[in-house]
UniProtKB/Swiss-Prot annotation:
Protein's organism: Christiangramia forsetii (strain DSM 17595 / CGMCC 1.15422 / KT0803)
GO terms, molecular function: ATP binding; cysteine-tRNA ligase activity; zinc ion binding
Catalytic reaction list: tRNA(Cys) + L-cysteine + ATP = L-cysteinyl-tRNA(Cys) + AMP + diphosphate
Family in the record: Belongs to the class-I aminoacyl-tRNA synthetase family.
Name of the protein: Cysteine--tRNA ligase
Cofactors (names): Zn(2+)
Gene3D superfamilies given in the database record: Cysteine-tRNA ligase, C-terminal anti-codon recognition domain, HUPs
Pfam families for this protein: DALR_2, tRNA-synt_1e
Length: 494
């Protein structure tokens, strides 16, 4: 029996505003789509929090035994400034300012994005499609929406008709906005606008002469609207109806609202069963955002090169800090908060490493199964990582109790205890036992040096003193000191 058949997972569905029991469309299989980055600059920590949150979701679903297809896109075209239907493409603007090709911008910041998430120990998605790789599919879905009567062409651009759509469906149901209120609170369209209503949004935009990112279409040489790519890529790889759609809270409106409208207009079906939204990271009490300059880059945290930091912090500690808050809660970033997380992280790791040396008894008075289920209960409650971490610190108290003899545990329970700690700390939370990794690296280094010492000894025995001295000198250059003695050669690392 798979774990998912034993555990009852509940998700907070943004559509209903309630926690709901998770039941995938196809038993044992999960389709999950998460909106990825627009790759025109380095990702900041606020962006990374969202992706760490959905990495936790991905990891736990896999742990439960689900076969998960996780799709996360790369936006490499069509995202205009201020998330609007007019203005300059963000990537094209960056290319113009740096005097390079747009795809050079895309390549540079996609590589940076992957490198940063790798440092945070995020699993890669199953599929990572790009907007520019799906232009044909985006044109085809626009044709379908036009044929179904929910869009119109104007001067080479195509717009989604929100008012007409709302007569048969419900635009605004995810964000809880009534279209009447939206109309009342929106300025009138300018005389130059091709839209019928201010709420309408672009499915295809005719490119201005200076717009260098353009593709041919039945309507004009132009580019797809930002909202369209996610509808196309999610449904292409997950089907017209799929299980989970995730993203930052700031994408709920208009991006996700528009995705729902496009999907329903094209297929008549609501595309997503569970909508999950991760909350923001704040700095100085305000939302972390590039547009306001109120952000911090991960590399600045790793090096300590930012005025808000008192020292550098490892990716491991930053991940632990992020997961100490529930993904739907606002999290405020500060150096003091990271210092607290670092202490907690080290305490947890030290306790885990000591399990192997715990004294075993003939009987256990530690209720292992109850504690283990409490860890699952935390994750089953909408991926409640802070409660899970609290349960792991309960385990630290138990470990200390076993050390001082106030709690007993058998060898069998000790093995299961360690395996359970490992599963929740490393497989699910995605933490890394850096000391163990460093020890493994240290063992590899020691083995390599011992081999060089042997080669040096062979050279000396063969009276090849030039090679012997070269090995000694090169090791010394990289901080490894050899010391010859009666018992042989030893080494120390400076």
């Amino acid at each position: 029996m798979a774990l998912y058949q034993e555990q009852s997972l509940k998700l907070y569905n943004s559509m209903s505003g309630e926690k709901e029991t998770f039941t995938p469309i196809n038993e044992g299989n999960v389709g999950m789509y998460v909106c990825g980055p627009t790759v025109y600059s380095n990702v900041h920590l606020g962006n990374c929090r969202t992706f760490m949150s959905f990495d936790l979701v991905f990891r736990y679903l896999k742990h439960l035994g689900y076969k998960v297809r996780y799709v996360r896109n790369i936006t490499d075209a069509g995202h205009l400034e201020n998330d609007a239907d007019s203005g300059e493409d963000r990537i094209a603007k960056k290319a113009r300012l740096e005097q390079i090709e747009p795809m050079e911008v895309v390549q540079k910041y996609t590589v940076d994005f992957h490198n940063i998430l790798n440092k945070f120990n995020n699993y890669p998605p199953s599929i990572e499609p790009t907007a520019t790789g799906h232009i044909v599919e985006q044109i085809e879905i626009i044709k379908t929406i036009l044929d179904n009567g929910f869009a119109y062409e104007a001067n080479g651009s195509v717009y989604f008709d929100v008012v007409k759509f709302n007569k048969e469906h419900s635009y605004g149901k995810l964000s809880g906005r009534a279209i009447e209120d939206m109309i009342a609170n929106t300025r009138e369209l300018s005389a130059q606008s091709d839209k019928r209503s201010p709420q309408d949004f672009a499915l295809w935009k005719k490119a201005e002469p200076q717009h260098i990112m353009r593709w041919p279409s039945p309507w004009s040489d132009g580019f797809p609207g930002w909202h369209l790519e996610c509808t196309v890529m999610s449904t292409k790889y997950l089907g017209e109806e799929f299980d989970i759609h995730g993203g930052g809270m700031d994408l709920k409106f208009p991006h996700h609202e528009c995705e729902i409208a496009q999907g329903e207009a094209a297929t008549g079906k609501s595309p997503v069963n569970y909508w999950l939204h991760a909350n923001m990271l704040t700095l100085n009490g305000k939302k972390m955002a590039k547009s306001t300059g109120n952000f911090i880059l991960p590399e600045q945290i790793f090096t300590g090169n930012n005025e808000v930091l008192t020292k550098a912090f490892s990716p491991n500690v930053v991940r632990f800090f992020v997961l100490q808050a529930h993904y739907r809660s606002i999290l405020d970033f500060s150096s003091d908060a990271l210092l607290g997380s670092e202490k907690g992280f080290n305490r947890l790791m030290d306790a885990y490493r000591s399990i192997e040396e715990l004294p075993a008894s003939d009987k256990s008075d530690f209720n292992l199964s109850e504690w283990k289920q409490s860890c699952y209960d935390a994750m089953n409650d909408d991926f409640n990582s802070p409660i899970l971490i609290a349960k792991l610190f309960d385990a630290v108290k138990t470990i200390n109790g076993i050390k001082d003899g106030s709690i007993q545990i058998t060898d069998t329970d000790k093995e299961e205890f360690k395996a359970t700690m490992s599963a929740f700390m490393f497989d699910i939370l995605g933490l890394i036992d850096a000391a163990s990794e460093n020890k493994n690296e240290g063992d590899k280094l020691a083995g390599t040096i011992e081999l060089l010492i042997k080669l040096r000894a062979d050279a000396r025995n063969n009276k090849d003193f030039a090679l012997s001295d070269q090995i000694r000198d090169r090791l010394q250059e990289i901080g490894i000191q050899l010391k010859d003695g009666k018992e042989g050669t030893s080494f120390s690392v400076k």
